Swiss-Prot record:
Organism, as annotated: Geotalea uraniireducens (strain Rf4) (Geobacter uraniireducens)
Protein name as annotated: Serine hydroxymethyltransferase
Cofactor(s) annotated in UniProt: pyridoxal 5'-phosphate
Protein's UniProt keywords contain Amino-acid biosynthesis: yes
Entry annotated with the keyword Iron: no
Pfam families documented for this protein: SHMT
InterPro entries on file: PyrdxlP-dep_Trfase (IPR015424), PyrdxlP-dep_Trfase_major (IPR015421), PyrdxlP-dep_Trfase_small (IPR015422), Ser_HO-MeTrfase (IPR001085), Ser_HO-MeTrfase-like (IPR049943), Ser_HO-MeTrfase_PLP_BS (IPR019798), SHMT-like_dom (IPR039429)
Quaternary structure (record): Homodimer.
Cellular component GO terms, alphabetical: cytosol
Amino acid sequence: MSILETFDPAVANAIRLETERQEYNLELIASENFVSEAVMEAQGSVLTNKYAEGYPGKRYYGGCHNVDIVENLAIERAKELFGAEHANVQPHSGSQANMAVYFTVLKPGDTVLGMNLAHGGHLTHGSPVNFSGKFFNIVPYGVTRENQTIDYDEVERLTLEHKPKMIVVGASAYPRIIDFAAFRKVADKVGAVVMVDMAHIAGLVAAGLHPSPVPHAEFVTTTTHKTLRGPRGGMILCREEFAKALNSNIFPGIQGGPLMHAIAAKAVAFKEALAPEFKTYQEQIVKNAKALAAGLVKQGFKLTSGGTDNHLMLVDLSETQLTGKVAEEALDKAGITVNKNGIPFDTRSPFITSGIRIGTPAATTHGLKEANMEEVAVLIADALANVENETKLAEVKGRVNAMMKRFPLYAHRLA
C-alpha cells in the first residue's frame, strides 16, 4: 500500500476511482487533457514547499536559487515556443492571466469589446457575473445567424461606435479559425489594445496548425493545460514594452507567492511542446476532430458552423427532443464525458442548454485515431437514441470501456 492509502484511504480511494474514470471512460470535454508522467512528477515535487514571491533574481524570500532556475527555464521555453518577447508563467489560471492584463491596460469603467459568452466566448471576456463584467463597460460581439462564425463586420461597427480601450479575442466554444489580423486592423482604427485569449488553441498555435496571435496582439493569454497538455495553470505573453507593468500586476497586483511546483510542470510541458513529435500529436487532434465531426454528421447530428477547424465541435440539439443537460447525463451513464453548452442564439438557460461541446485532445492523448472517431460517433448516437434506457446505456458503456482498454494511458497506476 502507498503512504496515502495507509494514512488517508478515503482520499486515496477517490483518486483511484478518478484514475479509473480517466483510464476507461471516453473523455471528450474540449478543455481537458491528460498530462505526461514527467509533468505529473514535477507537479508533485518538493517545489510545492517553496515560497518565492517576486521574480527570478528579485525575490522577497531567501533560498530561491533553485526555483529561479526552474522559472527561468519555463520563461525561456515559453518565449521560444510562441516567438514572444516576454512571458510571465506565474498566473495560477487562465482567468487570473486575463485579470492581470485587464488591470495592466485598463481602469475601472473603461470600455472593452469581448466575445459574447452565449456565442462561444468566456466568462472573463465580459460576463456580468465575472470581474470583467463588473469592473468594466463591456460591449459584446458575436457570430452571424447564417453560419455561426464571428461577425467581423459587427466587430468593426461596434469598435468604431464604442471606441473600446481593449478588444478581447478568443473563445471557449468556437470551432473555427480566428482571423487575428482582422481584429488588429480594426483595433488600430481606434487605437485599441488587443488581448488574445488562446487558452483552447495554444497547442495548435505552438504546432503551427492555427495562425499565431503573437504578431497581432499586445497581450496573449493562455492556460497551460487543454491542447497544450501541461499542468492546470495560466501564462501571459506580451511585448517587451509592457513587461514591467504586467509583472507588477501579477505580483503584487493579484497574486502572492507563485506555485513553483506548477511552474516546474509548465517548464516540462513546454519542453515536450518544443519536440517534433508534439506537432504530429497536434495534427492528430485536428484529424480526429474532423473525423468525429464527419461521423456525427453522418449519424444525423447538426454542428454549429457545419464542422470544425480545430480541436472541438458544438453539437446543436435544438431541433431534437434532447437538451444539452439530458445529453450530458445520458452520455455520462454511457461512459462518455462531454459538457452541456449553449449554442449561438440559444433560447434555453445555461443550466439546460441546446447543445453539447465535444473535443478530441484527451482521446488523442490516449492514442485514438480517425477510424476510432467513427466508432465514437456511433457510440454517441446509440447513447443519445436511448437516453431513458438504462440497459442500453450500460451496454454502450461496456463498448466504450472495451475500446479504451485498447489504449492504456494510466493503467500502470491501477496495477
